[in-house]
Amino acid sequence: MERDFCEIKLDEPLKYHTSFKIGGPARLFVVPNSIEGLICALSHFPDAKILGRGTNILAPDSGVDVVISTVNLNKCFVDDELIVCESGASLFSVCKKASHNSLSGLEFAYGIPGSVGGAIYMNAGAYGGQICDVVAWVEVYDGEKVMTLDRSQLEFSYRKSIFQRTRWMILKAAFKLKKADMNEINNAMEEIMTRRMESQPMDMPSAGSVFKKPGEDFYVARVIEEIGLKGLRVGDAQISTKHAGFIVNLGEARSSDVLKLIEIIRHRVKEHCGIQLQLEVEIW
């Protein structure tokens, strides 16, 4: 594989590349510098784990074999009311570019950590909006060819997309937005960020919401608090005292600590109200 296309690191600790600050070494950590480099890396390592910004990942303490990181694939440009981005671009930077160009539609996503690719993979959402609301098309690599799919082909639903049942790699995507007043966009974004800061442990290492919401009127954090688990700690992993839907790393948490907390929460919630919680965080 051409090193001009990719940077390659050996035995790279994944804790340096995940928002949880957890994870053992990747035997090979491959960082493509272009879409062509990404396709080249995928052709050499078709079974590699794909890592964007690492904000929704719990990596194992034992590490993994090969990781391909999209962090350097962050080009982004505006074409009238479309924003076209490579898959590694941060959602934060895309929201900022939208506001700077007076484009509305991504306000809900301001403050969601992670990459464009990860957001589409999970159909990320918050505050009444979802990524599927604004996706126009996605360019993907299926292991043999590059193809462009429009929104109707992506099988979006709550925290789901077609990419969770395929090995297709998201290369780039376009978001269809609308012209609006820049000040109104910025005000909406800042209001959402303030709400995040007030309600979520954004100053602590975590992977965001651990569990999917099982129903419109079911609030996971509230139930966890009701059954007395808020603040529960295993090793250096703790159910956040600020928002019980989050597990935070107090310093030296291990993946095994987090998994034990997840098991406790799921068991107690099932016992309390009969609901089997589904994970939103992705466990490698």
From Swiss-Prot:
Its cofactor is FAD. InterPro entries: FAD-bd_PCMH, FAD-bd_PCMH-like_sf, FAD-bd_PCMH_sub1, FAD-bd_PCMH_sub2, MurB, MurB_C, MurB_C_sf, Oxid_FAD_bind_N. One of its GO terms (molecular function) is UDP-N-acetylmuramate dehydrogenase activity. The keyword Cytoplasm applies. Residues 21-180 form the FAD-binding PCMH-type domain. It is an enzyme of class 1 (oxidoreductase). It is found in: Cytoplasm. One of its GO terms (cellular component) is cytosol. Its EC number is 1.3.1.98. SUPFAM superfamilies: FAD-binding/transporter-associated domain-like (SSF56176), Uridine diphospho-N-Acetylenolpyruvylglucosamine reductase, MurB, C-terminal domain (SSF56194). The active site is at R159, S209, E280. It holds the Pfam family MurB_C. One of its GO terms (biological process) is peptidoglycan biosynthetic process. Pathway: Cell wall biogenesis; peptidoglycan biosynthesis. It catalyses: UDP-N-acetyl-alpha-D-muramate + NADP(+) = UDP-N-acetyl-3-O-(1-carboxyvinyl)-alpha-D-glucosamine + NADPH + H(+). Cell wall formation. Belongs to the MurB family. HAMAP family: MurB. This is UDP-N-acetylenolpyruvoylglucosamine reductase. The lineage of its organism: Bacteria, Thermotogati, Thermotogota, Thermotogae, Thermotogales.
